[in-house]
């Protein structure tokens, strides 16, 4: 790669210091080189923001909007928003990427993704700005065949209670979760917010979750739950996308962790384009919130 080597040596000559330590195998970046690379990245970041700004002046007459999310959001949340957006702005191309939290975070960092819809972006991550889309609630899905259900009949949730969200009313009792201490659980894989959250909810009820199987996809796991393998924590909204299944029983949870935020995430400091702003506006979000209160963008109903 002579061309690249020449570029590196030219840069080193201009800055008067080596970028790489060539006495090591493999090559390592010098202190001066690391500073040089960070500075170049900042310059390129500013150039991309400048380019996006001038592209915006032309309005929403072209360009691409890169969206990312977990499989659930790509399957059930994005389609409606994308259809509404493209009806209004058919000249803008939508690029939708499905991935796990690590992949989506990397997409924001390298700017291959403009917006990410997720529940698991860390609140204390200063590199990400988050806009609240809505909140969701977790419930417990249990195979109907499990004997533990016999004594918990009064706590069962009907499909209508879940779809109407009336189960959130204070008068609807949550199941005593400790009754499931000996029940096998199906979980998402470690690193997934649902895995960490479910484990904490069980610990808060005085027991450790007995995991018998780990999966990547919530939709896959519900099919496994319905076949009697184990119980699982799921988002209540998923019930509306499945046909009624007598093999499943659902219960309300009484734990603050059973409620979580769904947010649109943007790389902090990057230029928020007109397409990004308009997409979030169609989702009911104001995209002009101050950095001091990033998760305050949801418009009042």
Residue ranges and their predicted role:
Residues 12-29:
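A short LG(V/I)-centered, amphipathic sequence patch enriched
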Residues 14-15, 36-58, 279, 290-293:
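Alpha-helical linker/hinge and terminal dimerization helices associated
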Residues 63-125, 214:
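Central regulatory/effector-binding core of bacterial HTH transcription factors
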Residues 71, 130-144, 153-163, 180, ...:
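Short Pro/Gly-enriched coil loops immediately N-terminal to beta-strands
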Residues 77, 144, 236-239, 244-292:
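A late-sequence structural motif
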Residues 100-104, 109-112, 119, 187-247:
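Hydrophobic hinge/microswitch elements
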Residues 142, 148-205, 272-276, 280, ...:
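Secondary-structure junction motif
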């Amino acid at each position: 790669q002579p061309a690249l080597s020449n570029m590196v040596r030219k840069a080193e000559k201009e800055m008067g210091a080596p970028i790489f330590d060539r006495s090591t195998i493999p090559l390592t970046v010098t202190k001066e080189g690391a500073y040089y690379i960070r500075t170049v990245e900042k310059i390129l970041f500013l150039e991309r923001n400048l380019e996006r700004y001038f592209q915006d002046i032309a309005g929403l007459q072209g360009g691409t909007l890169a969206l990312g999310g977990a499989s659930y959001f790509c399957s059930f949340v994005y389609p409606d928003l994308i259809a509404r957006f493209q009806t209004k702005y058919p000249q803008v191309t939508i690029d939708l990427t499905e991935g796990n939290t690590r992949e989506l975070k990397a997409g924001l960092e390298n700017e291959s993704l403009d917006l990410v819809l997720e529940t698991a972006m860390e609140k204390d991550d200063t590199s990400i700005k988050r806009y609240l889309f809505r909140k969701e609630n977790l419930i417990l899905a249990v195979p109907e065949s499990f004997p533990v259900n016999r004594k918990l009949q009064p706590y069962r949730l009907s499909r209508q209670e879940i779809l109407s969200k009336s189960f959130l009313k204070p008068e609807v009792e949550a199941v005593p979760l400790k009754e499931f201490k000996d029940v096998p659980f199906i979980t998402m894989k470690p690193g997934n917010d649902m895995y960490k959250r479910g484990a904490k909810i069980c610990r808060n009820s005085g027991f450790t979750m007995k995991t018998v199987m780990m999966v990547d996809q919530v939709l896959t796991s519900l099919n496994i739950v319905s076949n009697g393998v184990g119980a699982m924590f799921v988002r209540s909204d998923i019930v509306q996308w499945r046909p009624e299944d007598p093999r499943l029983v659902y219960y309300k949870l009484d734990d603050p962790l059973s409620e979580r935020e769904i947010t649109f995430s943007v790389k902090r400091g990057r230029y928020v384009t007109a397409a990004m702003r308009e997409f979030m506006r169609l989702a009911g979000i104001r995209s002009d919130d101050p950095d001091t209160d990033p998760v305050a963008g949801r418009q009042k109903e």
